[in-house]
Amino acid sequence: SICYDDTSGGDALDNRELRVVLAGVCALLGRKIDLLGMDACLMNMLEVAWQLRDSVNVIVGSEIEEPFDGWPYAEILSRLAARPRQDAAALARWIVKSYLLSYKGKDETVTQSALDLSRINNVVRKIDVLSGTLLAALETDAKPIAAAWKKSPRFYDDNYIDLLCFAKQLRRLPAPDLRAVAEALIAALKPGKGRLILSQGKIGREVRGTGGLSIYFPGDRINPAYRALDF
């Protein structure tokens, strides 16, 4: 959830409501939102990005909890004012860089990434294939798969897992089918221009090696609300 309102009992927008709200904004604008900045915790996950794919071109956010200081708005707004015609992808990459610089030397653990949602279908297709392969492998490789989960960075009471790190752990397993689909996902998660992950960075030992995008992967019970998401 995002946009908590302390004046109404802590009400907030969940992922389904966020999709509806932004679809309404797009209807008013007559086009997609160029860039959505989410200065909030845990927002750059695959399920959130999938919810927003029809409303937003580029999103910037963190896959972990953000410090209370949040974004360096003075620098970001100054950049936007100085370069009003800068395209969304370029500005998003700059925001990621500026955010990380603002926490350098402050003993904070942070992540930030920019996602081009026009490229999300390719990654979701790779996830679909990986999911099917994992299900088929559970009978023979449940313990190695569980070990790969445990060795991957997890966030929010272990409910979210870094997608890239998990794929890299799966790539080490003996099952050739799993290794192949994990390798394909790793390639799809490579950051750069024209890719889903335009840019990503992190500071802190706890997030070393993370790739800028998480996925919901709890260790036991799945939240019933998850089934109502587009993903």
Where do the language-model regions lie?
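Terminal, contiguous helix-loop blocks that mediate binding/assembly
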Residues: 1-231
